[in-house]
């Protein structure tokens, strides 16, 4: 009996001592909760890319020939389509909001791009014995104001966008008619619309990189062309669109990871 009581007492003492030692040990730190990434922030940044445009110009042949010969001499309609290409470079500023407990993101962004897009085509002037005209079209700048809707996969955002856009264009029809030089020039700042899509990756708390495709449509309008050599003037109809692929970086002012 004594041995049994002693054994029970020893076991109880061992358990109590073990509990006391365990109570003195530091608690294991809790595993920190990983916060969900949020795209709610404002941003500013820069971009660079390439642009391709199509400009259907009607009718540079009639413009040149009828300026020298008088209205009605040119028969038929001629459309010349320079296709300007070049570099676009600029900046953007905007704000985004990600809905709570949701992957959906809405935002607004203003962007402006300078452009080196240039294109030219030649046209024959059959009544000029014959003559040749060089038809040129340039796009100098492309600002836009767009809304965007995105779907976030944590720190990766896929989005579509759309809004209003402006194109700053220059047009020139130059050459000679019956050995007489001419040089018609015109300017056009045209309002249109733009749609696009892209992807953005936030690689740190404040910085992200993106790639984007944009399509611009500016419809058609009449452009006044003036010849500074001979004092002629006339109208051409221009229908145009522009496509741009660009990439860039954004700095998120409030931190994309807030």
Task: Set out the residue ranges of the language-model regions.
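Gram-negative outer-membrane beta-barrel domains
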Residues: 2-258
């Amino acid at each position: 009996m004594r041995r049994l009581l002693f054994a029970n007492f020893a076991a109880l003492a061992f358990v109590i001592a073990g509990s006391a030692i365990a109570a003195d040990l530091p608690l294991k730190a809790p595993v920190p909760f990983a916060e969900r990434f949020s795209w709610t922030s404002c941003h500013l940044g820069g971009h660079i890319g390439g642009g391709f445009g199509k400009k259907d110009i009607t009718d540079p042949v009639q413009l040149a020939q009828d300026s020298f010969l008088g209205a009605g001499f040119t028969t038929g309609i001629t459309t010349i389509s320079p296709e300007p290409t070049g570099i676009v470079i600029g900046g953007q500023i905007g704000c985004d909001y990600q809905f709570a407990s949701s992957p959906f993101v809405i935002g607004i962004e203003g962007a402006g791009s300078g452009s080196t897009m240039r294109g030219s085509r030649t046209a024959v002037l059959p009544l000029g014995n014959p003559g040749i005209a060089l038809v040129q079209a340039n796009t100098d700048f492309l600002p836009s104001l767009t809304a965007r809707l995105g779907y976030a996969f944590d720190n990766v955002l896929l989005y579509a966008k759309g809004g209003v856009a402006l194109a700053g264009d220059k047009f020139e029809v130059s050459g000679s008619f019956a050995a007489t030089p001419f040089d018609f020039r015109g300017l056009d700042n045209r309002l249109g619309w733009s749609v696009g899509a892209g992807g953005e990756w936030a690689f740190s708390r404040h910085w992200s990189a993106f790639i984007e495709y944009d399509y611009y449509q500016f419809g058609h309008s009449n452009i006044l062309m003036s010849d500074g050599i001979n004092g002629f003037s006339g109208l051409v109809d221009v229908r145009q669109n522009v496509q741009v692929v660009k990439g860039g970086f954004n700095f998120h002012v409030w931190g994309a990871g807030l």
